[in-house]
Amino acid sequence: VKTKAGSATKNIVEMNDGTVHGNLYGAALTDAASTGNADANEMTINGGTVSGTVYGSHNAGAGDAKGNTITIKGGSLHGIYGGFAAGTGVTTGNTVNLGDGEHSLAAGTTINGTIYGGNKANDADNTLNVNTNATAGNIANFDKLKFTLKDSTLNPANSVLRLTTGATNNLDWTKLDVDATGLTVTPKSYEAYRVNLMDNANGVSFTKGATNTYASSGAKQRTNGDLEYVIDTDNHTANAAQYVYFEALQFQNKQNAEFAAADGTKNEAWGGRTKVGNGVKNNTLTVTGGTLTQAAYGGLAENFTRDSAGNLNTAGNATENKLVLNAGANTLNAYGAQVRTKGGSAAENTVLLSGGTVTGSLYGGALTDAGATGSATANEITVKGGTVTGDVYGGFTNGSGATTGNIVNLGDGDHSLSTGTNIAGTIYGGNKADVTGNTLNVNTNATAGNIQNFGKLQFNLNSNALTQSTPMLRLSASGGTNNLDWRTLDVNAEKFNAPIKTYEAYNLVLMENIN
């Protein structure tokens, strides 16, 4: 339009094929003296080549270029502007859609330049909708970023938006959103379902102007039944090293998680896990093979969300989770549940060691943050077989809370331990001095390095699980066994039916420590 007073509004342009040797405009006011606006225009590019720049609207005058929409479905393109105002006008409220929300981009689609919401720094309501996998040089001047993830339009093996030219800056973390209602996710026991939303090897910054927009919330979360959706940067700061990612984890009611020989070697495996402080509850992981170089967890609780002051939130409990280690299992450490938050607790978690090898230590429930204020209580470990090279803890905390009411069972009460079963280290009711309610149940002949921090020792005699010629509990580590309470040592002989001779008493050594 070459008029000073006229406007260019509500025009529609669709490009299907061919080549534009120059720029492509949804609408244009070409007179520098123009006072009109170039608003609310629509453009759809299905294919073809544009050798110049794509403009939702271009205003050479003093007016605005706002409220325009560009939808890219295919083509070979360079720079893209939702709106461009050469004068004093604004370029706000523009929308660029990568994909139509129903289909992937056409094969061979390229965007070699930067996608701008508008050419002005005021980017209010400029929105980039990423509806499918796409690659561009960069993005700039967008107020809002929205990623729509659907099975029909997404290849999760590739980053949703890959940016290749320079760092991406001046984004607003509070206005990044993800719609995953059309996505089917199945987290594995050793990895979350993960999609990289943004991928820029030069970095992605959510410092908007001088404001760190990430600090007031940290990781974002959505909850869908037993699943949590986590949106975060790769280093949990405003300045991602390369990736902004979407993860799905099941934090509760995962009863059938498995890690087997076919899974090979991984760092970790878990039954249920949270990264945003949800309650990790009622999960079970069974390990039958493979190698875990860090740990196996029935439940694992973390929290990367932040409060309004930018501090990490402290919530995140783990309760009623279970870890089962069978023959073939091989892990460094093992936990009924581990809590890495400061305010969380670990309670009523269980470990069943039937076989396999723990080359580190075994924990019923553990709080690993040095500033942890919660407690590790009422956790239970049952040993039926296997080996532990390190120590065994019913409850453990690196912080200030209690480790009371925990139970360790040596044997299940009906059977002897599997051949070769051994605990080389010390068995602790808890690692704190308060031993209230910590109980060691010795149900069959067993060996360990030592025992410590138990309020009660219970020897349960079952003739079917007992060898008279061997002490029920043989302790082999150097140093004596101390701080036991004779008043709370007890023997239960309800299942004891060995014949008693007429000329001598039945003699059984309950506990032996030659040191």
Region roles according to the model:
Residues 4, 10, 25, 42-45, ...:
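Intrinsically disordered, low-complexity segments used as extracellular stalks/linkers
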Residues 1-8, 12-15, 20-24, 236-296, ...:
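N-terminal segments that cap or nucleate solenoid repeat domains
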Residues 2-4, 14-16, 21-31, 44-46, ...:
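Feature marks extracellular polysaccharide-active and adherence modules
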